[in-house]
Amino acid sequence: MNGPAADRRPLRPGANRPKAPRNVVPEGGRGPAESGRWRTLTSVLARHAALVRSRRALLTDLGKALLLTLLAVLAAAPLAAVWGISHARVDDYLGPHRVNFASNFGGEVEVNLGPIGNAYLASPVRPIGLTITVGGVGATTANLGSIFSEQTLAAYTSLYTEPREAISGIVERLAHDAVWEGLKAEAVLLLGVATWRLRRQLLPPWIIRRVTTRRAVAIYVVVVALVIGSILVPQKPKDPRYPVLIADGGRFSSLTVDSVLLADVLDRGIKGVKLLSARQQQAVKNYVDTAAVSLSEQLDALPKPNSDESMILGFSDLHCNQAMTELISRLARATEPSVMLSSGDDTVNGTAAERGCIRREAAISTGVPFLVATGNHDSNITEAQMRAAGVTVLDGQVVERAGLSVLGDDDPEHNIPFSVERTKDRPETEEQMAQRLVDLAGNKHSDVLLVHQPAAARVIMDTSNPPASLVLWGHYHAQSGPRVIMHEDGSWTVGMQEGTAGGVREPTFTSFSTPFSPPLISADVYFYFRDKATGLITGVQPVHFLPNAKLVIDDRIATGDLGKLPLETRIRLGGASATATVEPSR
């Protein structure tokens, strides 16, 4: 057949039959819709399985990363610890002198006295050592004589009497600084490890080929071994050493110096400290023993609250006095107050070396809450030591303890140690601090407002309707009050300027007096009686330890009559009865 039709392909058999619809399911088979659903389910399961595998891989990678990080931290720890210990520095006071403390690996305690030489003691924690650089030491014989005057020796008595407590506070600060320096070194080393992990992206190929992981680890191990080895090998002294004769056989039996002049000076100085320490300790013991007898003879006359009252023990300006700390502790055990309050100046200079006196004072409370508004002779170091000992240090916020709401703050001024000069801890005056506390109290009416200086207390007490039932302060080492401010609603505020609980005479105190002496003036402690229903202070009873070790218990001073309290005020304050509970004066 010729023409176009001849080139056509012949039709296959059945080619002209109509096509079956796509949705027709052959008998016994799976239709297209069901097949699509099956394929969708399969793909979902496949994706889920892939996701599970990826999560497992992610967790595996994360676990490997954490393990490598942990190994890196452990590997870096030795060098970080060495760096931290060898770079720890602290500035503080020992006695009246400004001192720099620096830890090292010399294996001994070196006291650098400038031009007159150095003193050395074996370190109790070898190979770790300590360099103590004492400031303000001159080279002339006249200056050396002033260093070991009776006043200066008295200031160093605590170092001889309680060397462990005096040094431990400084060691704590050094340890904190060493940890901080060590953490910084650890971070730098870990950054180096992270950089090593990214070396292929950061370094040229020829360096990568030469410095392999195995070689890097070997180099690091050698460096660590050399550093640790150099620390453990004892170092021989470079300069000649001369023993201090008075130290032979005593607690400083290993004391040596590198100067003959210094050996003679320390010989005389340690003799003076030993003599003065023995004298002071005996005086403290005699005072405590005599005062304890006077206390035991008057147990029945000690302050006692009525059944509907609680009792607060308050004091101020203890100044680390050892004798009074012991006697106040006995007084607290005998009277069992519900809470203790200090209006500050608990230390002499606020140095780390006064940790021992802070621990003794904290033990006075015998388990009851102890709250403090620190004074101008205390410091941030003092506050940290108090918190560590369990004392609540007020910081401008209301604190709830033993059913009392107490508001107070530390003094904005701080005395330079062993000086009458003061510096500002923050840009705030006494009056501004007091107004801030008044504004914070607002209409909440705290139970107690606690400050240190009268300048602050004056602002609070001159406020219309002072926002506290009890306002306490100290600072002047002289009792004044109680002063009662009546409110418009018939309630009242009691204000009290407390004397010195340490019996410290101010002129002597500023001349480097020491906590290791009996009270020089009346040592005063106060008991405040608080009505449980209304929270009002109904009485004050001062207790005095005189310089002759006699105990004087004043009569209870009534500060308010609950019977005259308006009924609506009583109900608002929480009291339901109008019956007076004021105890008559004894």
Predicted regions span which residues?
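Core catalytic region of metal-dependent phosphoesterases/phosphodiesterases
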Residues: 207, 302, 315, 320-400
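Beta-strand-turn-beta hairpins that frame and shape the catalytic cleft
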Residues: 259-271, 303-312, 397-408, 413, ...
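Acidic/histidine-rich helix-loop elements
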Residues: 272-285, 309-324, 347-352, 415-428, ...
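Extracytosolic and intramembrane catalytic regions of membrane-associated proteins
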Residues: 286-306, 318, 326-336, 384-388, ...
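His/acidic metal-ligating clusters that form di-metal
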Residues: 333-335, 402-407, 413-494
